Amino acid sequence: MASVEYLIKQFLTPDKKQLDLSNQNIGDKGAIKLTQSKNLCRLKKLILPNNNISDEGITAIANSENFKQLTDLDIYGNVISDDGVKAIAESPYMSNLKKLSLYGNLVEDEGAIAIAESQIL
């Protein structure tokens, strides 16, 4: 796997509003690295399918001020469970989210209820 900073340079759109890291296998360590990049503070769309991200990685993303402008979060095909979805549903930084793609994860009723009842989303 290439370094996350390299991937950001390669796949961040010129306007810095979209990052597509589909199928890069960044895992939780890579997801956490994303939260530390100041190049992503204008990001509107974050595309992370099939990256082996679990609750740890998505919780870091959900709790990062870097992503407070996100409107679109594609995290399908990872290993995120109810706890990770709850982190998204409860994070004040996810308040602009309009689209959340979760299919192919480990989300069950508890996570779905957290999204449905969220006062933030």
Language model features by range: what are they?
Residues 8-9, 35, 62, 89, ...:
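Generic structural signal for well-ordered alpha-helical scaffold segments
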Residues 15-19, 32, 41-44, 59, ...:
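Structural register of leucine-rich repeats
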Residues 1-4, 24-32, 51-59, 79-86, ...:
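Short, solvent-exposed loop/turn at the beta-strand->alpha-helix junction
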Residues 1-52:
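N-terminal segments that cap or nucleate solenoid repeat domains
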Residues 19-26, 47-52, 63, 73-79, ...:
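Concave beta-strand-loop units of leucine-rich repeat
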Residues 12-13, 39, 66, 93, ...:
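Residue-level signal for alpha-helix termini/capping positions
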